[in-house]
Amino acid sequence: MAQAKKKSTAKKKTTSKKRTNSRKKKNDNPIRYVIAILVVVLMVLGVFQLGIIGRLIDSFFNYLFGYSRYLTYILVLLATGFITYSKRIPKTRRTAGSIVLQIALLFVSQLVFHFNSGIKAEREPVLSYVYQSYQHSHFPNFGGGVLGFYLLELSVPLISLFGVCIITILLLCSSVILLTNHQHRDVAKVALENIKAWFGSFNEKMSERNQEKQLKREEKARLKEEQKARQNEQPQIKDVSDFTEVPQERDIPIYGHTENESKSQSQPSRKKRVFDAENSSNNIVNHHQADQQEQLIEQTHNSVESENTIEEAGEVTNVSYVVPPLTLLNQPAKQKATSKAEVQRKGQVLENTLKDFGVNAKVTQIKIGPAVTQYEIQPAQGVKVSKIVNLHNDIALALAAKDVRIEAPIPGRSAVGIEVPNEKISLVSLKEVLDEKFPSNNKLEVGLGRDISGDPITVPLNEMPHLLVAGSTGSGKSVCINGIITSILLNAKPHEVKLMLIDPKMVELNVYNGIPHLLIPVVTNPHKAAQALEKIVAEMERRYDLFQHSSTRNIKGYNELIRKQNQELDEKQPELPYIVVIVDELADLMMVAGKEVENAIQRITQMARAAGIHLIVATQRPSVDVITGIIKNNIPSRIAFAVSSQTDSRTIIGTGGAEKLLGKGDMLYVGNGDSSQTRIQGAFLSDQEVQDVVNYVVEQQQANYVKEMEPDAPVDKSEMKSEDALYDEAYLFVVEQQKASTSLLQRQFRIGYNRASRLMDDLERNQVIGPQKGSKPRQVLIDLNNDEV
């Protein structure tokens, strides 16, 4: 029985397979493909009108559909392909869109034919008419064909010709929506929102225009009233309101630094300075925390009793110490002022030159500075600023100037500044710069010079908080450093501000040896300089320890807490002094101990502001291997003196401009957070004035150096020792070859890698070779002609 069942099931399976195969054979009837190929061939013949059959097919479609027959060809081909492969009629949104598009094109073709042919289009295209048309022309124009004719004839009486046009546009839009497979509701919603937004913006623009027109009317009325008042007061003044023509006799307001000098001598200046600011945030100690902070400050001082700090090693506050008076500085000699008539003449020449080149502008103001004269140009509406900047050389030629610097635009002003060098640079002395401000409450206030307007410029170091000074040799960099140091000596006592001076050139800052403000003697050895900077880093970390234990955030809050503690407990705990570190030539330090110096500068510039430690770095080689990206990013304030190329200027201040400076103290200053440069003529300070101030300070108090801050003495070459017996031979080999590497020692002495590495470490520790700098070869620091070799 089981075998019989198996045989019956096997028979059923075979019969079902035969049925499916027979169905497939029926479905895969080749007649369908033959018909599809035939339709495609006929459509191609009709489209290209190939032979008698092609012309007959095209004539038939032309009679039915007119100019819209080309879309009909495409739709027939697409439908044939779809039906052949899918074996069903397409029923999609795109199919409906194609049909709607065909109807819309019938309307469009017939409307175009109606407007172009007139009465001819109104004739019914019966077969006799069609036959006559083909006798006169191979391809007569039937517009939308028979279908288009009857569609238009039926629609015009119902909805008029204008209504047919609207219906046609709607059909075209609907076909596009269907073909792109979108919903009419969504498209309508987006369209309405866009229309609303457009109307809203249009209303806003119209209201703004009305307000502007109203303001212009009020402004014109006000100007007319002012003009009438001026004419009543001064009837002899000519009207120069015409912007295109510049009268030669027009007086331009002139401001000069010579007038400022006379004003400053007669009365104190009430003008607020550009860079003066009050730093009053995060420094006030709350009264209800006084008891807790007293205990914290006692614990802090007890915890650091075993260490010799700057306060303990330094001097006791000298009550009798008096800051040097400004009378020690020389009074500036009277100099020949720049002729105002000559400046007026150049202003008229500048206007005429711009006018000759098609630039409509006028000189609204002239500022005579110590080194340059700035002509403030106000261009007319529609004049591009770049057009004025591109006339740089032509302006210099017309004014017979050595060079011209264009500031376009002047920050905060709707004007362009053209800076022309004076025939003679006026000397700016440090005394006239400090006369109005000193003595200052800010002990780190330093004088820089005078700006283009002739106003004295002083800046607080604690707001910089670090400064980069760079420029070529002889541009005034060392004078600027001397002016900064002298400003500190004239304003701060030794217990208020401490100095650390690093001078690898050995001649610039040696005059300050012995002043009580110094932490250590002036450092001239580059190796000691790197160690001195590391000592400053250690002092910074110690101060942050104090701030942490006393719950204060910076040096100002800590000193306020100490003063309050001294008043309440009648004690004399020393306050933390500000420390200013000045490096006069960074390039020499980077060449000898670049890695250590860069790391120390990075730590100081990143963290030392709150600790009251400020760094001033000067160099005469503003290249990227000296002013590295790390140093540049961490020093926000920069002073650029005259340099030789725009590349050097970009290295210092990030933009060009320093290459057009005149030298002799002419500088560009970029403050912390400022996006624009300020041109300043640096204050001059003679060597005798520096010596007089130093003598006055030293006579009152001698220097009391902090031994803990002094760098370690360099290793004596005669005492260099190494446990390796090959050290002497390796030493001589490296000095002779003037190159050193671990692989070189391995090959020369046939030793392993570990021993060669230890020899390299010994040579570096004994200052025979420099530190490793990535893939670059190590520098040999000892010459073959050295006596020690």
Swiss-Prot record:
Annotated disulfide bonds: none
Assigned GO CC terms: plasma membrane
FtsK domain sequence ranges: 454-650
Keyword terms, alphabetized: ATP-binding, Cell cycle, Cell division, Cell membrane, Chromosome partition, DNA-binding, Membrane, Nucleotide-binding, Transmembrane, Transmembrane helix
Record PROSITE patterns: FTSK
Binding-site positions, ATP: 474-479
Residues passing through the membrane, by range: 34-54, 63-83, 99-119, 137-157, 158-178
Membrane topology note: Multi-pass membrane protein
Topological region Cytoplasmic: 179-789
UniProt subunit comment: Homohexamer. Forms a ring that surrounds DNA.
Description of its domains: Consists of an N-terminal domain, which is sufficient for the localization to the septal ring and is required for cell division, followed by a linker domain, and a C-terminal domain, which forms the translocation motor involved in chromosome segregation. The C-terminal domain can be further subdivided into alpha, beta and gamma subdomains. The alpha and beta subdomains form the DNA pump, and the gamma subdomain is a regulatory subdomain.
Family: Belongs to the FtsK/SpoIIIE/SftA family.
Name of the protein in question: DNA translocase FtsK
